[in-house]
Amino acid sequence: HLCDRLLERGCEVLCLDNLLTGHEGNIVHLLGHPRFRFIRYDVCDYVYVDEPVDAVLHFASPASPKDYLEYPIHTLKVGAFGTHKALGLARAKGARFLLASTSEVYGDPLVNPQPETYWGNVNPISPRGVYDEAKRFAEAMTMAYHRYHGLDTRIVRIFNTFGPRMRPDDGRVVSTFIVQALRGEPLTVHGDGSQTRSFCYVDDMVAGILAVLFHPSDRPPAQRTDRTFLYVNADAEDSIHHPINLGNPDERSVLEIARIVLEATGSKSPLQFVPRPVDDPGVRRPDIGRARRLLGWAPRVSLEEGIRRTVDYLRRRVGAEALV
């Protein structure tokens, strides 16, 4: 989706992905485009590009619980080594850098909704901690490059994106519920389903990411003291260089999401209640005040409409066999 929108803007796009959790079918329609190139590559390795680079967007990482629990060490390596390599490329090219972070940096929050100023409630040694801490470290390194090297950096904290091109088996609640409903299988609800989530449709999320990416820098000229760059505005609360929440503040319970999916699919699937995973967050809702103030951005697509569009996609992707 992001590559599509960048190409529509007239950008040249070089996409690097090792496809550990990705699907090449999501970009197959772009492979013949004159301004698009794809290289299968692991960002944890040395990253070098011959041509000039205007922006480096670092989205590499397993991102669903199913994936980062299957690849815990690689998830940590991407957050550390991958972020370092991507930042190094941006610095070498004098490029703008954007880090895709996550609402998981807030852990199982004790504050709801979560503003960017909230430091989170994270268990660093839990199974989920590999993703939480990988992204927290990536944010710290990104801010260090901004403060020390003067790199123009951006950080977006993404809250639960969904929509077409999701993997049917990615383990996320929306795709899991939809596929189960289409197949007439029970919808597996963790716990009693009272835990809440806030889901943002992919088109809205991409619009927010691009608004952050193309927003002018508010950093004043650098003043160097010894080995440290000091910026008058570097730590201002509403600096574009500080993390920005992107998500839909429309908070729903998991049970309500199941109901919406059943209605959208016309399925009669029953609900099956299973134990909640360790450190599964009880609430999740973004405070998007900073995005509204700085970018004039807010999501437009409702959860119900987004789920209908996603059902249409997954119905085609999964295939007609054994579907209700």
Where do the protein language model's features map onto the residues?
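Short, conserved catalytic or interaction motifs in soluble domains
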Residues: 21, 164, 248
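N-terminal Rossmann-like NAD(P)+-binding domain of SDR-like oxidoreductases, especially those catalyzing
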Residues: 1-161, 181, 213, 283, ...
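Residues that form or flank phosphate/diphosphate-binding pockets in enzymes
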Residues: 22, 47, 168, 252-256, ...
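C-terminal substrate-binding subdomain of Rossmann-fold SDR/epimerase-dehydratase oxidoreductases
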Residues: 41-42, 85, 160, 181-324
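Residue-level signature of the cytosolic catalytic core of signaling kinases
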Residues: 32, 126, 166-170, 250, ...
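Amphipathic alpha-helical segments in well-structured domains
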Residues: 83, 174-175
